[in-house]
């Protein structure tokens, strides 16, 4: 994070302002990625008018960075109408897309509208691997062609690569492809549960040995000895630190208007179809609970050697049944990195019972004559 963005984030935190929002315009997609955590059916997306009204409310609340994502954003026929409205409200706009539907005309229009960056999902430099993950033959070549269109318009493109068993051996090739295309490249070695709580796709996560190799690859981590060194003991400042920005300076809104702390944290805090955005942000009891949590409040993590360095995701912890609990995926990454097991992993060796799971159910309701989706009702399943 740049010094300017850090200053903005710190100021937003002090003032209680939602600096950054991810708005998913749709869960519909033209790809069917094996690791996707979304339900691609349409349960009653917000209309163009509803989204424009929401954008105005977010601007009034002080939102600066707006990330438009999905699903596939270009599946919405009103995408550019929404984008024009967002730019008129002076948001800094970032897009997440597979880019398959982008042609020269769309790339030029994105340039004219001043989009800050476009993140494009690429899983391998080899068509047979990428296309097997997306389940769409020819998708890699179409995404690469779109990236060339975007770059020809002078747009900033970031290739995003989720690492899993199917493509773990290909990340060097993806980074070389990014260099050839003149783009940045990010790698994420975490496959997350589906938003309905289904954990079957976690079998796609790379194993410990693959993570160890990744974390010792100095082209990825820099100095491997420093990156993999034992963590320092947590300090008093660490104990008082925030878990992450979710619910503090950032939040997520689904295509159905559900308001969550983060896209990976499906704790419903309200619905913008029934409440003003700012009222949910300020008054939601769920958000207030999220904001109250510090490292010292986490029974396992506050006692863990990794407390000062762990990238624990409270959303993934929530999907395991307790937002104040550990995130096993992050525990496994810390162990692969340092060779030191977390308190959570040590406890799991002594237990037979698995963690509780959380199921998120879409509850359809009729509002007037229009089907809308009320939020994700979370129920803990022992």
Question: What are the functions of these language-model segments?
Answer:
Residues 46, 92, 108-113, 121-275:
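Radical SAM enzyme [4Fe-4S]-AdoMet core and its adjacent flexible, acidic
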Residues 19, 64, 238, 247, ...:
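Exposed loop/turn and edge beta-strand positions of beta-sandwich/beta-sheet ligand-binding modules
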Residues 25, 29, 257, 277:
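Conserved, mostly hydrophobic/aromatic
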Residues 1-117:
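Conserved alpha-helical substructure of the radical SAM core
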